[in-house]
Amino acid sequence: MKPIEVFKALSNESRLEILQWLKEPEQYFTPHEGIDMREIGVCVSQVTEKLNMTQSTASQYLSILHRAGLIKTERLGKFTYYKRDEEVIREIGEYLKQEI
């Protein structure tokens, strides 16, 4: 984990919202093609619709979260799915307790 990258990724309200939505995706999204959103994740088109932004902006936000290690990706066919990396998020919490 690179704390600076994590905090940069978290410095945007929409990216924070994405992380919140991915915590309990069934509350915020309709399953895409029968995909288990907890196990596999949420498709970029679902995030795009929820953000009410362009797909390129949503993809950029997801990419930033992914590079920071906050989310994982899984490719199934032509779709990429995103879900939270709960282990990294726990590490961030521990880091904050110890370092700040």
Where are these regions (language model features)?
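Short, Lys/Arg-enriched N-terminal segment that forms or immediately precedes the first helix
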Residues: 1-7
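N-terminal helix-turn-helix DNA-binding core of bacterial DNA-binding proteins
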Residues: 8, 14-54, 80-87
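Histidine-centered divalent metal-coordination motifs
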Residues: 15, 60-61
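Alpha-helical residues within the helix-turn-helix
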Residues: 49, 60, 66-67
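Beta-hairpin "wing" of winged helix-turn-helix
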Residues: 67-76, 83
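Short, charged/polar, Gly/Pro-enriched secondary-structure boundary elements
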Residues: 88-92
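Residue-level signal for well-ordered alpha-helical positions
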Residues: 95-96
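A common structural junction motif
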Residues: 99-100
